[in-house]
């Protein structure tokens, strides 16, 4: 299940060495990778060094695309083909190390704004869509021509939504077309009126309309995962969509449709269980999963305030890629919260190889903030920026004297009554002075020290003062297969 965060470690060992072959025929490169638009982007900026970020599955075309762009723009192209948490986020750090003045991101993207103001453009690598088959599938799933429906798609199929809507509008009166929410260029003005942005998409809602009034028709399907429940783009849509509205998906190649109601129910049940685990937890580990997405520092501070307000202890862990072996070194942590981009925030299933569950920031918000979710909002947002002040979905913590904190709460897992959180001042460092001793020593009680003393193994024993002091002597010389003090036989 760790593959949810990045490519499995075994993939590097199983991959055959050598230059990968060309995946896209040369005549189709311009169309698939939108090279004319990309070349115009580079020329308009006047960049001399540009970073081209490719996912693993598209590296076979990287050399041909870079050569074509160098020929048409005269700029130097650098290929970025390795990222720590998959390739959906813009690798700003890698681009800066190459001295690039702009980044061109190819392939699936979470469309999260980068943490640093570097010019970025996205190429979603268009996937062919059988429009006639999709029209028949839409008509079969939506017999009522007056029902409000939103057209959604995976990023690679977004180019075909307007054409699909053109074929459907003569019959369907209330049709809304979504579009990818590309980050606005630095210094540009927001359009007026500003469309609603949710799930990495923009929705041009009419005045007085709400997204919760619409059903959904999704065109696309993940080719990377054999389990559709682990498709992060579709999963975040199913989790955040209004539970009472229909949601169906359609394969862009065959037109095969599926009602996603049952899958959405399974996903919501799984996430509600994780929220209950977070409410029962006393120690929370905050995993820093991204440094290249905007507002990650503010989100980390927000999560720490949440845990403190709920009477929980939190630890910030920067471990690189989360793996079961790394997280097993922290048995005192009850749950982990992964601070990552919207696609990486969906944690793997609890039945996987991780010893403790891994949550999304929204699930910690639901567990620690008694005022969450706001009325009329589906209780799951995958982007941590939606939880911060300034977002229309931000819900401030109730004051300490609010009755919301005193509401009786029973754990649905253990059946025990949860005590209300004990409020502490911000100057409290987690230890409580008990009694001053006559020798002017101070006895303290620390939860961390109490847990350490109860562990059967507490680490390497220093044994200070119990081992004799010896003089330094010469060690072995040579290499492991032939030390000088060993025979040559």
From Swiss-Prot:
Pathway: Protein modification; peptidyl-diphthamide biosynthesis. Keywords: Acetylation, Iron, Iron-sulfur, Metal-binding, Phosphoprotein. The modification N-acetylmethionine is found at residue 1. The keyword RNA-binding does not apply. The keyword Iron-sulfur applies. GO terms for molecular function: 2-(3-amino-3-carboxypropyl)histidine synthase activity; 4 iron, 4 sulfur cluster binding; metal ion binding. GO terms for cellular component: 2-(3-amino-3-carboxypropyl)histidine synthase complex. Required for the first step of diphthamide biosynthesis, a post-translational modification of histidine which occurs in elongation factor 2. DPH1 and DPH2 transfer a 3-amino-3-carboxypropyl (ACP) group from S-adenosyl-L-methionine (SAM) to a histidine residue, the reaction is assisted by a reduction system comprising DPH3 and a NADH-dependent reductase. Facilitates the reduction of the catalytic iron-sulfur cluster found in the DPH1 subunit. This is 2-(3-amino-3-carboxypropyl)histidine synthase subunit 2. It comes from Pongo abelii (Sumatran orangutan). The lineage of its organism: Eukaryota, Metazoa, Chordata, Craniata, Vertebrata.
């Amino acid at each position: 299940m760790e593959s949810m965060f990045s490519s499995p470690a075994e993939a590097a060992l199983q991959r055959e060495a050598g230059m990968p072959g060309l995946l896209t025929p040369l005549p189709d490169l311009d169309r698939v990778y939108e090279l004319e638009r990309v070349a115009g982007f580079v020329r308009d900026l006047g960049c001399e060094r540009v970073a081209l970020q490719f996912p693993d599955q598209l590296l076979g075309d990287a050399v041909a695309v870079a050569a074509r762009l160098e020929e048409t723009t005269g700029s130097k192209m650098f290929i970025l083909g390795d990222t720590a948490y998959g390739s959906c986020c813009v690798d700003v750090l890698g681009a800066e190390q190459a001295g690039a003045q702009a980044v061109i991101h190819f392939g699936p993207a979470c469309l999260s704004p980068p943490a640093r103001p570097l010019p970025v453009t996205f190429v979603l690598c268009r996937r062919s869509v059988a429009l006639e088959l999709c029209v028949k599938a839409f008509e079969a799933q939506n017999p009522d021509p007056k029902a409000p429906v939103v057209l959604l798609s995976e990023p690679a199929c977004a180019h075909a939504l307007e054409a699909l809507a053109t074929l459907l509008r003569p019959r369907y009166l209330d049709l809304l077309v979504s579009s990818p929410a590309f980050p606005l260029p630095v210094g540009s003005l927001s359009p007026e009126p500003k469309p609603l942005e949710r799930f990495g998409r923009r929705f041009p809602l009419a005045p007085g309309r709400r997204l919760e009034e619409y059903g959904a028709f999704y065109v696309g399907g993940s080719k990377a995962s054999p389990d559709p429940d682990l498709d992060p783009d579709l999963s975040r849509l199913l989790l955040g969509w209004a539970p009472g509205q229909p949601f169906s998906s359609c394969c862009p190649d065959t037109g095969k449709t599926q009602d996603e109601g049952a899958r959405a129910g399974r996903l919501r049940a799984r996430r509600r269980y994780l929220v209950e685990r977070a409410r029962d937890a006393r120690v929370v580990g905050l995993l820093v999963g991204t440094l290249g997405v905007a507002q990650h520092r503010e989100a980390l501070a927000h999560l720490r305030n949440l845990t403190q307000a709920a009477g929980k202890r939190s630890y910030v862990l920067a471990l690189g890629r989360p793996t079961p072996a790394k997280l097993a070194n922290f048995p005192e942590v009850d749950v982990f919260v992964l601070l990552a981009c919207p696609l990486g925030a969906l944690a793997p299933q609890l039945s996987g190889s991780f010893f403790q569950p891994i949550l999304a920031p929204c699930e910690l918000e639901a567990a620690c903030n008694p005022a969450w979710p706001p009325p009329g909002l589906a209780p799951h947002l995958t982007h941590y920026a939606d939880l911060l002040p300034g977002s229309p979905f931000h819900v401030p913590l109730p004051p300490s004297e609010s009755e919301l904190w005193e509401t009786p709460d029973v754990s649905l897992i253990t059946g025990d009554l949860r005590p209300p959180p004990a409020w502490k001042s911000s100057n409290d460092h987690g230890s409580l002075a008990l009694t001053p001793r006559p020798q002017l020593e101070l006895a303290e009680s620390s939860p961390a020290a109490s847990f350490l003393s109860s562990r059967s193994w507490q680490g390497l024993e220093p044994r200070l003062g119990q081992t004799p002091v010896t003089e330094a002597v010469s060690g072995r010389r040579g290499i492991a297969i032939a030390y000088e003090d060993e025979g040559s036989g």
